[in-house]
Design a protein with these regions (language model features):
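Catalytic zinc-binding patch centered on the HExxH motif and its immediate surroundings
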Residues: 27, 84-111
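Long amphipathic alpha-helical segments used for membrane anchoring, targeting, substrate engagement
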Residues: 1-37
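Short pre-active-site segment immediately N-terminal to the catalytic Zn-binding motif
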Residues: 114-132, 162-166
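Post-HEXXH active-site segment of zinc metalloproteases
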Residues: 144-171
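Active-site recognition of the HExxH zinc-binding catalytic motif
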Residues: 62, 110, 128-145, 175, ...
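Pan-zinc metallopeptidase signature
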Residues: 207-258
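Extracytoplasmic low-complexity, Pro/Thr/Ser/Ala/Gly-rich segments
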Residues: 26-82, 249-252
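Short helix/loop segments within enzyme catalytic domains
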Residues: 49-71, 169-212
């Protein structure tokens, strides 16, 4: 296992990078997902209900927002709960990977034990962290169905030396998309208490590469970052939160232009 708090924070680092972890770039045989879809029968425990509520709200947000920010109708995804390990379109995934998005079968996966430990360790803050994870993973789905992820992989292939830089930009954009969703929640006065927005920002910081390396006792080397620093992740979540506009999530500095 990964050891202490939030499963060592190492697992939370993995909530966003399934293709790298499982060696999938969207090619190869697709195995069926094994688990329970996040329908009514799956939303039983408190943490499951929190995730299911976030899934419903994030889905509705993108159904409304997608036609404005991108072209066409939002191609929805689904969330699969699993325990221990599961088979996905990206290969076999264990609980050590944590929550993730698979671009091949276009599904979001949540390990139930991970979510329960998140809540046990952090209480209400864990609830907000779980919602942040949902919004972030749905951001990866948006990147996938809009072709952003494909363009990033092409750029990484043409410029291997900048591969990590493009990975960071992809993750920061998903953080910004999550912030745009959180902005819609704030507009509807759906946060339970004033401190929840700050908790979301702290959740974004907690998965910064520098924080994760520091907690693991490893040297902090910005050149090795694949997700962004705590400051960057907070900054881009804040950008989405402040603007409420996914089109302002310009983390690539024009690199994705045709």
């Amino acid at each position: 296992g990964a050891g202490g708090g939030i499963i060592g924070l190492i697992v939370i680092a993995a909530i966003v990078i399934l293709p790298q972890l499982l060696g999938s770039s969207g090619d190869g045989d697709i195995d069926p997902a094994v688990g329970e879809s996040a329908g009514p029968t799956a939303c039983v425990t408190e943490i499951e209900q929190i995730v299911c509520g976030a899934v419903d709200d994030v889905s509705l947000y993108w159904e409304r927002q997608y036609p404005e920010s991108f072209q066409g109708t939002f191609p929805g995804t689904d969330t699969v709960f699993f325990a221990g390990a599961t088979q996905t379109g990206c290969g076999r995934a264990s609980a050590q990977i944590g929550p993730f998005y698979c671009p091949v079968d276009q599904l979001v996966y949540f390990d139930l034990d991970f979510l329960q430990q998140l809540q046990d360790e952090f209480g209400a803050t864990g609830d907000l962290a779980a919602q942040y994870i949902v919004a972030h993973e749905y951001g990866h789905h948006v990147q996938n169905v809009t072709g952003i992820s494909d363009r990033v992989r092409q750029l990484q292939g043409r410029a291997p030396g900048s591969a990590n830089e493009f990975s960071v930009a992809l993750e920061l954009q998903a953080d910004c998309f999550a912030g745009a969703w959180a902005s819609s929640v704030a507009e509807r006065d759906l946060f339970d208490r004033p401190g929840e927005i700050e908790e979301a920002l702290l959740a974004a910081e907690a998965v910064g590469d520098d924080r994760i390396l520091e907690s693991a006792g490893q040297e902090i080397d910005p050149e090795s970052f694949t997700h962004g620093s705590a400051e960057q992740r907070r900054q881009w979540f804040q950008t989405g939160l402040d603007t409420g506009d996914p089109e302002q999530c310009r983390t690539f500095n024009g690199a994705l232009a045709p």
